[in-house]
Amino acid sequence: MNEIFFLIFAFLTIYLSIKLSIYADNLSKTSTISKAVIGGLLLAGVTALPELITCTSSILLKNPLLSLGNILGSNLFNIFITALLDIIFIKKIYTTKTTKTNYLTYLILIINYLVIYMFIQEKINITILNIGLPTIIIIILYFIYIKLLPKNKEEQIQIDLKPIKNIKGKLLITSILMIASSVLLTTFVNNIAQSHPSFSSGSIGAILLGITTSLPEVITFYTLISIDNYDLALQDIVGSNLFNLAILSFADIIYKTSPIYNIIDNNTTTILFLGLIFIIISFLQNIRTKCISKVTYIIPSIIIVSLYLYFWLIGFI
């Protein structure tokens, strides 16, 4: 029965997330802020709302490992989808160059992942009031990221969307429904995890919550690529990943028992490590100025897709 309710609220959460993204796009259409701010903050924040609610709910349900799996699994899935769509849309993306704003986001992501990995490996073990060092670094770097985002009005998003009446009211109502749906979704996933003790809560969180809550980002990414706006699409994905880590730091703060990173298990550690590798590969792929051919361009994407499928289909199952 838990599985049926999970599917119901998973579809509802995805639907509400899509609606939120549409409303955010319409709201940004009349805005004078830059593409980087809209992609890195507005779209990333709106599409990451399910992660925020499900992550917080996991802590309140006293299953912090579910929260870790959710965030790390979501980030892993995001990069996997980026690589997969790189392959599918190779003709559109091959000649596209990304901005330096994306480089900044990638670098901050890599630093955050390295700090978390070193912390759980006990290379650095600094805590303040039961809050882990990674949380402090994530928060500081996120504020630096916001500060450094270009806020000029020159670079505007041009997305052909029909104006929506009373958009702010609809955005608010949809957000409230999203919160309720995400809480119930997390509750049923937690029940599934409790009824399957042979599986890690982190892995279940990564699969059921991580992938479900990431689908809005995937849809946004696909839509932006289809209208030849790869730079904004990439900014949305890496910006969402960065925002997800900020959510994880919030979870660490409200999880008062110990740093949340201390309860990570082997499966979740593997997800973290794969996430770090994927982000580095994706970063190196996007900073290249020249490629000999489409084949050499697409090799990193093939590596990411292959590793992801191997981990879930062979390594885990």
Task: Identify the function of each model-found stretch.
Residues M1-I317:
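Hydrophobic alpha-helical segments, chiefly the membrane-spanning helices
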